[in-house]
Amino acid sequence: MGKSKKKTKGSKKAIPVSGKGLRVGIDFGTSHTIVALADGGNHPILTLPFDYDDEVLSTDRVQSCIAHYDGHFLYGPAAHACYLDHCEEGAVLIRSIKRLLVDWYEGQEIELGREVISVEELLKNFFFELKLAILRSLDLSPGTEIEAVISVPANSSSAQRYVTLKAFRDAGFKILRILDEPSSSAIQFVHERYKRWDRVQADVVIYDLGGGTFDTTYLAIKNETYDPRLTRGVARLGGDDFDEILLSLVEEESSQSFEGAERVRMLDVVREAKESITPRSKNLHIECDDRLVTIKIKDFENEASNLVDESIALVDDIVERASEGESEADRVVLVGGGSLLPMVAKRLRKRYGRSKVHKGIYPLASVAIGNAIQAESPDLAVRDRLSNHFGVIRVCEDGSEYVDVIFEKGQVLPNQGETIRVERPPYDPRYNIGRFRYLECDSIE
């Protein structure tokens, strides 16, 4: 491979590990993966090194991407740099392996260049490289065991949860717990805002607009117990969609169309520009082929308003359903990179009041930090609930299909040693032999 043209940062000084072992919280995000260390009440974000040619690319926001070039797979920042350098020479890039998990099925394979590889294997390899980078950042031997709390989007299917958990374990991590991402953010928010976080009693709505997914969860928090009572989400709504909108405005204004590596580079440029927007910003000046393209913030917000409206509609839904049970949210907490957009906070404050809407101090790292807190807090309990309905499809006499729900969405999962008993009305089958078709879904009409 040729030498990278990308400027890189050097490795930072290693953080000492205290206690009996190495525990971390990991946020495997659509755009970036972030790791927080559980170090005796401190939860620093690790800067992770990845080798690329003769350089070390170090970052605390690891791109969740994989590249293939010249018979080799590369991961994270190395994959991103390789694609920018060698796109015209045959390098291929998956910008987000996490998006592949939305519709994952066992045995699913994808083609990268001339290589055919299973999604499960790609995911395992990405996590293995992540593990090596964690140990390297802390000057620990490759054989050191890492205990981790990980997270998934709140509306993840059982298949996505399974393949994520299995890939982490196959990569050598010892998984202590898997949490929903909004629950992780709630843990971080409570520890950030309250001095006596073990004596908190509050109802909190988490608005989590990440790179590729949106989740909102209504949590009832009492002392050290977190109960995610209601959850809604969209698997393909996130900051990446806002980046595409902004890039389309740049293309329109500059009369250009970006493809391949140039498009990937420009998406990075517009993302950085998007993250620089403040409540007082009027225009964005974006460098494009040695010229500055000016985009009015008003035009960008008009184009992106439908995405924000879609997310707020889901918040309204869970708040309304919770209020039917005589509950009222004390806080609406904004987390995730997409929540940094001023238009998001502005609309939510208009809807729910300025005093209720809060931005976290670490909106980009709240999930990783929350997971790290859980990793070293055995008394902190997060109740598990089913994220989707689960049932059996039945064909009626007229040929129509009906779903017999076995477990309803929101069903509290039992603790170890407990069982769930579910009673459903019986029906008389026409045959005493058949093929069961199971269904997992977010809603049933």
Model-inferred region functions:
Residues G41-A171, D180, E244-N283, L439-E445:
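Phosphate-binding loop and its immediate beta->loop->alpha context
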Residues A14-I45, R193-R229:
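Gly/Thr-rich phosphate-binding beta-strand-loop-beta motif of the actin/hexokinase/Hsp70
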Residues G2-G21, R177-Y207, S366-A381:
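Conserved phosphate-binding catalytic cores of ATP/NTP-utilizing and phosphoryl-transfer enzymes
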Residues E115-E129, Q160, I178-P182, G238-D243, ...:
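Phosphate/oxyanion-binding active-site loops and adjacent basic polyanion-contact surfaces
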Residues Y83-L84, E88-I94, K98-L101, Y105, ...:
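Gly/charged contiguous loops adjacent to phosphate- or pyrophosphate-bearing nucleotide/cofactor binding elements
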Residues T47-D51, A81, Y226-R236, S254-Q256, ...:
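Short beta-alpha connecting loops at secondary-structure transitions
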Residues K7-S11, K174, I297, A381-E445:
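Acidic low-complexity intrinsically disordered segments
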Residues A171-S184, A345-G370:
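Conserved phosphate-binding/catalytic loops in two-lobed NTP-binding clefts
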